[in-house]
Amino acid sequence: MVSQIRRPDDTVPLVGSVALNYNCGGVDDHGVRAGLSGWKRDVTAADVDRDRFVVWMPTMCCEAHLRCYNRRDISTAWGVKAEYTRFYAEGTGYQLDRADAAKVAALDRALDLIHQYDLILATGHLDRNETLLVVERAYAKGIRRIILTHPLFQSTELTPETMHRMWTQYGAYSELCFSNLAMDHLTYDQYMAVIEAVGAPGVLLSSDVGQIFSPTVGDSLREFFGEFQKRGIKEDDIVQMSVLNPNRLLFEAMS
């Protein structure tokens, strides 16, 4: 946990996160409160962590995610043995429907805390309609730090036009990850279409590596940025998408 390993003399800021999967309490305020508490046992009595962190909507327990991986939370193609993955029966993954009052109320409890403490919201592996609903409700509550989690990923599959609308209407950044190219068979042509539609101010470039077969963060980003430069993306735009935009989301004042 970042709150437990962070040191006063750190020269590089460490930023934590929590994903609201079932094993963290699901989509409600429980996981957010745990993150705010610094992961202390009694989250109601703990002091609130002063540092901003990322709150992801569900990822590997989403019904949309499970449909992509034969009902397993983790794909064996990622280098994980099947016995270390979890199988979810049809329909048991997380789903969000605006007609489900209980689930929407639980979502709102999580969003209220994210807004109250000015945290960063990432949309996780929700499907297209679920993603749009979360962004819509988050923005209405005043949340301004919003990331569309690798929105070309097969569980979500937003179009570049939709990403453009999410940026202009809600200020939601579209994330393009190096790892999705190999793992999920996405292409640089698809990434270029997103950059063209949204513009560098509304895009985040990240590695999302850490798998046993992936390059290091440094090597992956070096390759990633080099491929964009070969395709005509200016260095200033790469800096915008990989440094300035994340810095704004994490550390700068936003209104």
Which residues does each PLM region occupy?
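Histidine/acidic-residue-rich catalytic or RNA/ligand-binding cores of hydrolases
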Residues: M1, L132-E136, E157-M163, D184-I195, ...
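Extended substrate/RNA-proximal surfaces in nucleic-acid metabolism proteins
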Residues: D10-V12, G25-L148
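Active-site beta-loop-alpha junctions enriched in small/polar residues
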Residues: S17-N23, P58-C62, L126, P151-Q154, ...
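Short acidic/histidine-rich active-site segments
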Residues: A200-V217
